[in-house]
Each structure stands twice: as structure tokens, then as C-alpha cells.
Amino acid sequence: MSRTPLIAGNWKMVLDHQQGTLLVQKLDWTLKDAKHDYSAVEVAVLPSHTSLRTVQTLIEGDKLSIALGAQDVSEHDSGAYTGEVSAAMLAKLGVTYVAVGHSERRQYHGETDATVRAKAAKALAAGLTPIVCVGEALEIRKAEQHVEFTVGQVTQALTGLTAEQAAGLVLAYEPVWAIGTGEVATPEDAQEVCAALREAVAELFDRATADAVRVLYGGSVKPASIAAIMRQPDVDGALVGGASTDAGDFAAIVRFRDHPA
């Protein structure tokens, strides 16, 4: 099955709404100059919640082909949950994608696999596409338990979903030891885990569902490393962190097919 690559930029807590607007404008100009085909490689940006409305207004007003994503979503529908943002609220803002279970949410906010499962379910129910993030810490990698660990995370996150729901989400493998450290998993490392995650989906549901799910790699993705990573058969895109806050770098990652083999 042919899966459309997705390059998603997670801005984290780096850009404010003004900086985000400028970045999206520069990104759009750069990709237009390159005659980028968004149907061949999809592009999404994930601003912080305070920038969503501003970026959404720009995307809709200028009819840009860049998709809008959010960095988190509540596991609750509505009510007295101070600081939370529901899936329905994000959907009303024109959000398409939402990251759930990012390693920084797990590390700093104590999110568990059960939390991730609940958030993914709420996102799907609201018509959003959750980007379910999984990944291992350095000690797990050194113990050679990384495949077992990440497969376990995916199994926990997807348990209770239907095959149709599972086919409508995106998985992202982010080796925690390679996030913000400058360390990059080799293309072979990325392929090993991404293939294992796809097999886990096949075991949970069926082969057709596994073939439909896009699996991204995230972990210090740079323009210099993206082409080799994207040549792997089970890697369908990238969840880009720091490099996504620079329009030139992010555009170069989006244009990975222009890079020499």
C-alpha cells in the first residue's frame, strides 16, 4: 500500500504567535518556490495552543496547503479541568493532527500509556488524527529491550480501538535518547523499530490496518539525515522538533526527495 509521507513540525514551547506566523509564511514561500506537491508529501505544523488561532487564520485566509496540528489534547470532553483543551475545541479551530504521548509529556507531566490511550480515543472521536508517540530511554536501548518496550507502548495505546480507528491514526517513534541531544538513531535503527510497530498493529488488528498506518521517525531530525531515514520502507515521515522552528531547515526536510541519495 502506498502511504503519503507526512512531515510534521513540533514547535514545542519555542515560538510565540507572531514568530509562528512569520515561520509559516516563510515556509509557504520556500515550498512554493520549490513547486512542492503537498499531495506527494504532506506538511503539518504543531504550534503551542496560544498560537493555534493565529496560524489557523493565516492558513485558511491564504488558502495554504499546510495542515494544522496541536501538541496535546485533554482526555476529558469538557468541564472543570483548568488549563485543559478538549478535542472538540481543537476540531472547531480547524486542527487536523494532535500529538499524544510525546516523551516530554510522559517525562514532565507523568502521562501513562492509559492517558495516551484516552487522549487518542478523544481525538479520534472528534475527527482529529492523533500522532501517538512512543520511544525508549537510553538505558532501555542499551539493554536491547527497545523493540519490546515500544511495541508494549503501542499495544497499550491502541487496545480498545477498532481497526477503522487504528487505521486513522499516525504512530511516531521517538527514541528519547535522541531528542534534543544531537544524537540520531541510524536509519537502520529507525527501520527496526518502525517495522516492529507496524507488525504490532497487524497483530492487534490485521495486515490491511497495519499497511494503512503511517509511522514517523522523530529524534533530532535534520536536513542532512532525513533522506537516508526516509529511504527505509517502514518510515513514512518525520516528527521534527528543533529544526521545524527554522523555515529553511524545515523546508529542506520536507523536500527530502531533492537530497542526493
Swiss-Prot record:
Class of the enzyme per the UniProt entry, highest EC level: isomerase
Record InterPro entries: Aldolase_TIM (IPR013785), TIM_sf (IPR035990), TrioseP_Isoase_bac/euk (IPR022896), Triosephosphate_isomerase (IPR000652), Triosephosphate_isomerase_AS (IPR020861)
This protein's pathway: Carbohydrate biosynthesis; gluconeogenesis; Carbohydrate degradation; glycolysis; D-glyceraldehyde 3-phosphate from glycerone phosphate: step 1/1
Any GO BP: glyceraldehyde-3-phosphate biosynthetic process
Top-level taxon in the UniProt lineage: Bacteria
Reaction(s) catalysed by this chain's protein: D-glyceraldehyde 3-phosphate = dihydroxyacetone phosphate
Keywords: Cytoplasm, Gluconeogenesis, Glycolysis, Isomerase
A single GO cellular-component term on record: cytosol
GO molecular function, one term: triose-phosphate isomerase activity
Ligand binding (substrate): N10, W11, K12, G180, S220, G241, G242
Compartment(s): Cytoplasm
Catalytic activity, EC: 5.3.1.1
Catalytic site: H102 (electrophile), E174 (proton acceptor)
Keyword Cytoplasm: yes
SUPFAM superfamilies: Triosephosphate isomerase (TIM)
Family: Belongs to the triosephosphate isomerase family.
Protein purpose: Involved in the gluconeogenesis. Catalyzes stereospecifically the conversion of dihydroxyacetone phosphate (DHAP) to D-glyceraldehyde-3-phosphate (G3P).
Record's subunit section: Homodimer.
Stored PANTHER family: TRIOSEPHOSPHATE ISOMERASE (PTHR21139:SF42)
NCBIfam families documented for this protein: tim
Name of the protein in question: Triosephosphate isomerase
Species per Swiss-Prot/TrEMBL record: Kineococcus radiotolerans (strain ATCC BAA-149 / DSM 14245 / SRS30216)
Gene that specifies this protein: tpiA
